[in-house]
Amino acid sequence: MTRWEELEQLRERARARGIPVARPQTFRLLLDTVRSLNPERILEIGTAVGCSAAGMLLAAPRARLTGIDLQEDCCREARENLVALGCAERALIHNGDASEIIPVLSGTYDFIFLDGPKGHYFEYLPFLKPLLPKGGILFADNVPFFGYADGERKAPRR
């Protein structure tokens, strides 16, 4: 079985457990974008169990990824999944609140995948902009997500 097939099985298992994973068309667009950019450094906000992180690392073999997720169990599982998919040596997963971690990150990221709590997207933007070099890409998932991203609705907390 290829790494890509293993990743697809991981995505299916996560979806069956109710873990949010990018929709198939979004995931394809994400991976196509990462492949075309071939970034050296990727930042992912909202890593969950590492499906998108693994996909981006498989799509960009020279990339290093920094992931952030609030849920400790998700971070632990993401690390395990990255090991299983052969990507762990190129990933650093932070467990914590992205609004506290993003401001202390150093350097720049060629690609930022914003897939965390939708109601905080605007809060993160002033801190993300300095992390993007000229030509860098910010890829935000689910905008607007049922009114959460623009603050019309309060996002539920898990």
Where on the chain are the PLM-derived regions?
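A short alpha-helical cap/connector motif
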Residues: 1-111, 118-139, 143-158
